Every structure is written in C-alpha cells, then in structure tokens.
Amino acid sequence: MSDLSIRSARPKDLPAIARFAAELVRFHHAIDPDRFLCVDGLEKGYERYLSGELRSEGVVLLAAEENEKLCGYVYARIEPRNWNDLLESCGKIHDIYVDPSVRRSGVGRRLLERAIHDLEALGAPRVVLLTAAQNESAQRLFGSFGFRTTMLEMTREAGKPPQKME
C-alpha cells in the first residue's frame, strides 16, 4: 500500500465511484432485501447524484487511489439539525467502500481517518454514521476510531408474522 493516496474525488472519478456505490447497495440488499432497496440503474443514478454533491458545500467525497487505479471511496457531508433524529448539525459518513482486492490493508482506515479530519475541519462537532447490524468488520473499524452505538434501528415488515428476538 505504499503507493496509496487518499484525495478529493474529481469528476473523472465518478464512474468508478458510482460502481463502488452500486456494489455497496447490492451488499446491503443481499444482507436484507426487505430493508435495503436495490433498483435498476444504480451506477447512473449514483453518478448523477454524486456529480451534484461534488459541487456542494459541506460535502466530503474522497477517493482512494493506488497505482493510478481507484480502490475505494468515502462520501460524507455536514448535515443540518434533524428534529426527527434528535440530532444537532454534525458530520455524517454516508458511504465508505473498499474494493475487495485491497480490503484489510488499511485503505478503509485511511479513508475514515481523512473523512473525519475533513468533516471536523468543516466545523463538525461530531461525526455519525450507520452500519448494517451484520457488518461486524466495519463495526470493529468504526469502534477503533471511537464510534459508539447510540441508536438501534428496528424494522417490521407489514403482513409478516413476528420473528423471535435473539
């Protein structure tokens, strides 16, 4: 990983980042297809959405690049006060993805470290994120940075019998 760089994303990075984002959606959908959406045109939709975000204030969109090839990204932004979530304005990490070929080599750690730094530089008094309950490796990474569990989302599907809690 000596040639790894973490940098601000550029417009030319968006097709690769959109592919990564689509893979992240598919990963979550595979975990729980009732909870996580998966629609046609994910790549184009993400490319269009992130193109607008790239030009927005308070957005952190970073690319991990090794040997001139993208191998991960993180998307975060400063979010305003949210009364529904009882949350003051904060930095929120929405996506972090590392290509499977370079996982467990420090790319995710470097992306997360830089995203936190950039959000704090933008004035975030705290950084929050969500992670799938089943994604234990991500939870360990986030925990190593001092993230703690503050909420637990629970979902119930209409018309389905209750499942026993473990």
Please place each PLM-identified region on the residue numbering.
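Conserved N-terminal entry element of GNAT/NAT acetyltransferase domains
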Residues: M1-P15, K160-E166
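Conserved GNAT-fold acetyl-CoA-binding loop/helix
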Residues: A22-Y49
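A short helix-loop-beta-strand connector motif used in the catalytic cores of GNAT acetyltransferases and
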Residues: R48-L62, K92
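Conserved beta-strand in the GNAT
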Residues: A63, K69-I78, K92, Y97
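A conserved beta-turn-beta hairpin within the catalytic core of GNAT-like acetyltransferases
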Residues: P80-I93, R103, T150
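Conserved acetyl-CoA pyrophosphate-binding loop and the N-cap/start of the following alpha-helix
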Residues: V102, G106-R114
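Conserved active-site alpha-helix within GNAT-family acetyltransferase domains
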Residues: R109, A133-M151
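Conserved GNAT acetyl-CoA-binding A-motif
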Residues: E120-L130
